[in-house]
Amino acid sequence: KTSSQTARYVLDRTFDAVYNRRPVFDSRYMMPEYGTVTLVDNNHDDRYDVVIINDFESFMVEAYSENDRFITMKNRDENGKNIRIDLSAYDVCEAENEAGERAEASAIIVPGSVVTIQRSADEKSIYISVSREVMKETIESITADGETKKYSIGGNLYEAVPNCYIPDGADTPGSKADIYLDKNGRIAAIMKSEDAEGWKYGYIQKVWVEDA
């Protein structure tokens, strides 16, 4: 299923499934909210033998503590609290930079970057990809396809990730914004541009008036 469109395929009765790079034996993981599903028909009998599921979560980083290996996100959970991920809780933790090269998490996870995360179903493995791609553009319009928001920017259409980080009013149509993309080219965060048009206020602290 992609947004509001649904397709159906026939699986072999003994199919194997791989979820976020690890074997899985639970059909609940077959339909990721944000991800891809690849079907493989090894013996060409029109029944798929292998299902490869990539389930992504993309967030904007607020802070990373190298000591306790916690990533704190700007994104909030359903209780309004910052989402936090404890990397030390995983047996396997792999990170890659914008070029897709392996790197130490502490070297590439910085405030303001976007991380795209894949966690295994048994919560023993986590894979992190970092993106620092930012567009400074005017938001032309916003539409929706099911629960997926789509933004027209610079004549192109971009989909937002689930739980996209958008402070109040940052995605107002007609406004200029800093648009942060994740590794898949989807919008992970929208922030008001510092040079966006609007009133600017100031005040005078001291005034000297010379006698004429």
Residue ranges of each PLM-predicted region?
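...the same signal can extend to comparable exposed beta-sheet modules
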Residues: 1-212
